[in-house]
């Protein structure tokens, strides 16, 4: 495996929003990570263990990202993405539908950095305002109304900034490292909406042009959908983006709603998938696998966005602390404006992609 993307791979990353790197991680590093997972005690969090962080820090992924993206903090922790085998369930998912009714192995395509409150398992009653208030009052910090102090069960704030103009955390790149056989569909793979990073960038630009409010509760993006079976579904990507990726082949839920078909990323142990922050994505149900799905997930931010802030490799809201704490920034440094700039200009933090990007500028079909 080389230490840099080829021109063709960079073209693919530009077009699709992701690239799969075959055998980016050595067998020794994969085995060390698997052994650490196997030896973990019940309830033990092994994200900070060197056997896990070395999947990035001691593999070719680091020089590849340095070349394509730029400098970043070496991850000191990660998300241990283990999905046990399961059959379609009768519980409501975060979109407000029964798990068994959600197409594409239950994929709930979303943007990272968005608050999630556990899905109500009973049909919600009341007006939309009442459903909204009750839903977010059920979060871990209780009833704080509509506020940047509200935290989700995923420990993401409702809003990133005090003025409540930014409701998404952001970073630069994902790295998903595969530790088990995921070469056939339905094994819990990460699913990606190929090419939708372009649509998300344009949508953020449009939101900013309307009223400078980006993310859910900004223009064209409601936070909740009250017309789903449980009357309280998270709207994880803008409806116009979802609809633009639907066609006659798209599968539907029983209410007739079509859903954009994501691509399941088929990988072998040691493969890695690098994506832009901007690409909508999801895990999926491990229905056909012979074992638990094991993906180790890293979130990477180009160091130039906030040189004085260390990013830990797992947070999807690094302008706030991991648990939502307010961070201190020097005078003149508006972190939320910097993040809005990055969300509206997705290639600005990909230093090694600039020749590719410039070659495609002015070409709408790219």
Task: Name each model feature, range by range.
Residues 1-8, 364-366:
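Basic/polar N-terminal segments that are highly enriched at the extreme N-terminus
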Residues 278-282:
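Short, charged beta-turn/beta-strand-edge "cap" motif at the junction between a beta-strand
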Residues 329-366:
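Intrinsic low-complexity, glycine/proline- and repeat-rich
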Residues 268-271, 276-277:
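Catalytic cores of PAPS-dependent sulfotransferases
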Residues 5-8, 13-16, 25-269, 285-291, ...:
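Non-heme Fe(II) oxygenase catalytic core, chiefly the N-lobe of the double-stranded beta-helix
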Residues 3, 19, 23, 319-321:
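Helix-turn-helix-type domain boundary/helix-start signal
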Residues 214, 301-341:
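Double-stranded beta-helix
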């Amino acid at each position: 495996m080389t230490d840099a993307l080829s021109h063709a791979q960079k073209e693919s990353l530009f077009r699709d929003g992701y690239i799969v790197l075959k055998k980016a991680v050595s067998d020794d590093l994969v085995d060390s990570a698997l052994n650490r997972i196997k030896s973990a005690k019940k309830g033990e969090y092994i994200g900070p263990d060197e056997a896990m962080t070395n999947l990035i820090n001691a593999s070719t992924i680091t020089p590849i990202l340095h070349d394509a993206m730029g400098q970043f903090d070496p991850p000191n922790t990660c998300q241990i993405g283990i999905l046990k085998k399961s059959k379609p369930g009768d519980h409501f998912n975060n979109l407000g539908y029964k798990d068994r009714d959600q197409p594409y192995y239950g994929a709930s395509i979303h943007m990272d950095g968005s608050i999630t409150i556990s899905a109500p398992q009973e049909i919600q009653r009341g007006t939309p305002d009442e459903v909204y208030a009750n839903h977010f009052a059920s979060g871990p910090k209780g009833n704080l109304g509509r506020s940047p102090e509200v935290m989700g069960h995923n420990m993401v704030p409702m809003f990133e900034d005090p003025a409540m103009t930014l409701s998404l955390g952001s970073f630069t790149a994902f790295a998903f490292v595969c530790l088990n056989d995921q070469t056939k569909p339905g094994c819990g793979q990460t699913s990606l909406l190929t090419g939708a990073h372009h649509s998300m960038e344009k949508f953020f630009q449009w939101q900013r042009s309307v009223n400078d409010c980006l993310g859910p509760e900004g223009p064209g993006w409601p936070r909740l959908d009250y017309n789903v079976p449980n009357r309280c579904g998270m709207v994880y990507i803008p409806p116009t983006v979802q609809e633009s990726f639907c066609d006659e082949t798209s599968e539907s839920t029983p209410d007739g709603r079509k859903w954009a078909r994501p691509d399941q990323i088929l990988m072998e142990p040691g493969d890695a998938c690098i994506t832009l922050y901007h690409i909508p994505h999801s895990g999926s149900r491990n229905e056909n696998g012979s074992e638990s799905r094991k993906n180790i997930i890293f979130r990477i931010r180009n160091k130039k966005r906030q040189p004085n802030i260390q990013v830990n490799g797992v947070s999807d809201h690094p302008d706030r602390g991991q648990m939502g704490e307010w961070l201190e920034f020097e005078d003149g440094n508006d972190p939320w404006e910097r993040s809005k700039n990055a969300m509206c200009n997705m290639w600005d933090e990909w230093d090694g992609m600039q020749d590719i990007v410039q070659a495609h500028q002015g070409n709408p079909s790219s």
